[in-house]
Amino acid sequence: MKVTAAFAGLLVTALAAPAPEPVLVSRSAGINYVQNYNGNLGDFTYDESAGTFSMYWEDGVSSDFVVGLGWTTGSSNPITYSADYSASGSSSYLAVYGWDNYPQAEYYIVEDYGDYNPCSSATSLGTVYSDGSTYQVCTDTRTNEPSITGTSTFTQYFSVRESTRTSGTVTVANHFNFWAQHGFGNSDFNYQVVAVEAWSGAGSASVTISS
């Protein structure tokens, strides 16, 4: 979730409101987790066996959604994707997203975003260079907020790509290793997904995951 809003209902599956256009994500094999924190804020459909999902949201979104597909247990393996992502005027991310169980942490590797950079309102940890670009790295502490274990206090880690892109390979290990210098557990992973998140404006995306 964005730094300035609580992330609730991580394990909730909500029916989606109909909308005219999709966000599409696919992976050839291995998908075994659906992230569906939607709350009827957009049109979310998926086919887990095919490794595809769609999401489209219209103006009027005033709360947070995070949807995506991935794996019940995350890893530091690289993820290759390509996307057609449109979030002009929307507070939104296209990111690798997940959780670490202990110490409990929520993380984002933000490849592209709309009109809000999460590192603009968080504590800077510096920068890391990976996959042809510098990433801003920042952290925030969420106190008594909803999490994967209920209400808890946990750390958020963000790497935000300066040269935003919608295709390429994310060398996840580069980010995990950098964050580990600042308290990230880098083990005992919970789920990990390629995700679309938004909490204002309108947008859509089309993504293919190939690793």
Swiss-Prot record:
Key words, A-Z: Carbohydrate metabolism, Glycosidase, Hydrolase, Polysaccharide degradation, Secreted, Signal, Xylan degradation
The protein's annotated pathway: Glycan degradation; xylan degradation
pH-activity note: Optimum pH is 3.5.
An example Gene Ontology CC term for this record: extracellular region
Signal peptide: 1-16
Domain GH11: residue ranges: 19-210
MF annotations from Gene Ontology: endo-1,4-beta-xylanase activity
The protein's enzyme class: hydrolase
Pfam families: Glyco_hydro_11
Active-site residues, as the UniProt record annotates them: E106, E197
Localization annotation: Secreted
Catalytic activity: Endohydrolysis of (1->4)-beta-D-xylosidic linkages in xylans
InterPro entries in UniProt: ConA-like_dom_sf (IPR013320), GH11/12 (IPR013319), GH11_AS_1 (IPR018208), GH11_AS_2 (IPR033119), GH11_dom (IPR033123), Glyco_hydro_11 (IPR001137)
PROSITE patterns on file: GH11_1, GH11_2, GH11_3
Example GO BP: xylan catabolic process
EC number(s) from the headed UniProt entry: 3.2.1.8
PANTHER family the record matches: ENDO-1,4-BETA-XYLANASE A-RELATED
Known function: Endo-1,4-beta-xylanase involved in the hydrolysis of xylan, a major structural heterogeneous polysaccharide found in plant biomass representing the second most abundant polysaccharide in the biosphere, after cellulose.
Family membership noted in the UniProt record: Belongs to the glycosyl hydrolase 11 (cellulase G) family.
Name by which UniProt lists this protein: Endo-1,4-beta-xylanase 6
Native species: Aspergillus niger
Gene name tied to this protein: XYN6
